[in-house]
Regions:
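Short amphipathic alpha-helical segments
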Residues: 17-18, 45-46, 72-73, 155-156, ...
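N-terminal active-site segment of His-dependent metallophosphoesterases
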Residues: 1-50
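A general structural motif
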Residues: 26-28, 54-56, 139, 178-179
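Divalent metal-coordination and catalytic microenvironments
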Residues: 8, 36, 51, 62-63, ...
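Acidic, His/Gly-enriched loop-helix segments that form or flank divalent-metal centers
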Residues: 97-209, 213-218, 228-229, 233-234
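Active-site neighborhood of divalent metal-dependent phosphoester bond hydrolases
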Residues: 44-48, 53-132
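Residue-level marker for buried hydrophobic side chains located in beta-strands
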Residues: 5, 31-33, 59-60, 142, ...
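Active-site environment of divalent metal-dependent phosphoester hydrolases
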Residues: 10-14, 39-42, 66-69, 185-194, ...
């Protein structure tokens, strides 16, 4: 019975399954997936379809899920004059921006699903949380996809807006909480300044950064919060 977190799978189904095998994931365990399951790689929706069968996997919203949800909702609709009118400049700009960050692979995969599978994907995305706060083995953790933009120690987590949680990474040189760990993804650890091990989990200043670059030729990383053991989908 253990608690794990992984993040930024970006369609790497084999990496996802490799981690589950390594940790011998079972019904007594808990796994948090900290956003950006989708895009860049080809099998993000395949991962979601597997995740939704496992009630002990808890998904957290990332910026790629946000972009996908806005556009996939429209792709589910029958094309009529009324909803064609919804294609304003803002929507088209959002679609193009999503495609520019790897969304085309998700669109292609979505088109291959049947109607029920597509609807189940949209329903599942609506269940994603914005953050999680948990205690494991006496340590407290805040799990959020990108960070806590406009951070203030006295500000309740519930007061943060969506855009403050999924777009901007924290300052990894700064301690945000003296008494808990801030667990994030979003920013590949290879670009964290002075990180001695690119594409590996970065732990410093009460931060745990989990994006090991799966969307950019790196790997999927996973950490066990009970003992801080690390697992990787590749031997980099």
């Amino acid at each position: 019975m253990a608690t794990y977190v992984m993040s930024d799978l970006h369609g790497d189904y084999n990496g996802y399954k490799s981690i589950l095998k390594q940790i011998t994931f079972n019904e007594s365990d808990t796994l948090y997936i900290n956003g950006d399951v989708l895009d860049r790689g080809s099998y993000g929706l395949k991962i979601l379809l597997d995740m939704m069968l496992k009630p002990n996997i808890y998904p957290i919203f990332g910026n790629h899920e946000y972009a996908a949800y806005q556009c996939l909702k429209f792709l589910m609709e029958e094309v009529t004059e009324d909803n064609i009118e919804k294609l304003d400049a803002g929507f088209l700009e959002g679609l193009l921006e999503w495609q520019s960050i790897g969304g085309q692979t998700t669109i292609d995969e979505f088109h291959k699903l049947n109607h029920d599978e597509r609807q189940s994907i949209l329903d599942y995305l609506e269940e994603f949380s914005l953050f999680e706060t948990i205690t494991v083995a006496g340590n407290d953790f805040v799990i959020v996809h990108a960070g806590l933009d406009n951070f203030n120690k006295s500000r309740p987590l519930e007061d943060y807006e969506l855009h403050e949680l999924i777009f901007r990474s924290p300052d990894y040189d700064k301690i945000y909480f003296d008494d808990k760990y801030l667990v994030t993804g979003h920013l590949p650890t290879r670009v964290i300044d002075k990180n001695p091990k690119p594409d590996h989990i970065y732990i410093k200043n009460n931060h745990i950064a989990l994006d090991c670059g799966a969307g950019f030729g790196g790997q999927v990383g996973c950490i066990c919060l009970d003992n801080f053991e690390e697992f990787y989908s590749k031997d980099i």
